[in-house]
């Protein structure tokens, strides 16, 4: 944890072209992600300042995941007239595979409504190569030692019509600016 904290503090103080955003290295804190004890991860939180506005920042770092078909360069859109940042990250197939694995693994205990929304949104915004997506799902399930269920409970009325699921979905939707779309 201390090493990752040190690295993020260094990044916060990196000399970059001024864009109005300043990261406060004294606010960097790390904690182990405990959502699922089977997987190792660290959450890093810190504060960014945009003028007088405080912006809560969070980075989740996972370890030991398989990335299929491999890391990709992702160019993020810039809000201001600055060069768009480019980072290496998970391909969409791996993102979907990990979220789908969590849906299957957690069964009726799943409270991660954002995963369902993310998969829905990705499916609407991007075309997927079915065979590559299948490879990513197979690799993720194998790495996480999860059996592929042909009829995941997360897609049945036993889950979707549970009072707790409906309440969690309604609460999640209320946080979205475009809640009526889903």
Question: What is the role of each PLM region?
Answer:
Residues 2-182:
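Structured mid-to-C-terminal alpha-helical surface segments
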């Amino acid at each position: 944890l201390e090493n990752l904290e040190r690295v993020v503090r260094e990044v916060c103080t990196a000399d970059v072209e001024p864009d109005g955003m300043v990261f406060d290295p004294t606010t960097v804190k790390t904690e182990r992600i405990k959502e699922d004890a089977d997987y190792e991860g660290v959450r890093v939180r810190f504060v960014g300042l945009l003028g007088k506005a405080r912006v809560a920042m969070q980075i989740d770092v996972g370890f030991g995941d398989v990335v299929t078909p491999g890391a990709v360069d992702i160019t993020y859109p810039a809000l201001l007239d600055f060069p768009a940042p480019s980072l290496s990250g998970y391909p969409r197939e791996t993102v979907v595979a990990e979220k789908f694995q969590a849906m299957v693994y957690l069964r009726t205990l799943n409270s991660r409504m954002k995963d369902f929304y993310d998969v829905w949104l990705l499916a609407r915004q991007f075309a997927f190569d079915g065979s590559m997506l299948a490879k990513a799902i197979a690799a993720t399930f194998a790495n996480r030692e999860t059996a592929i269920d042909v009829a995941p409970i997360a897609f049945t009325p036993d889950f979707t019509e549970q009072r707790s699921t409906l309440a969690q979905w309604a609460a999640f939707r209320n946080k979205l600016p475009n809640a009526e779309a889903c």
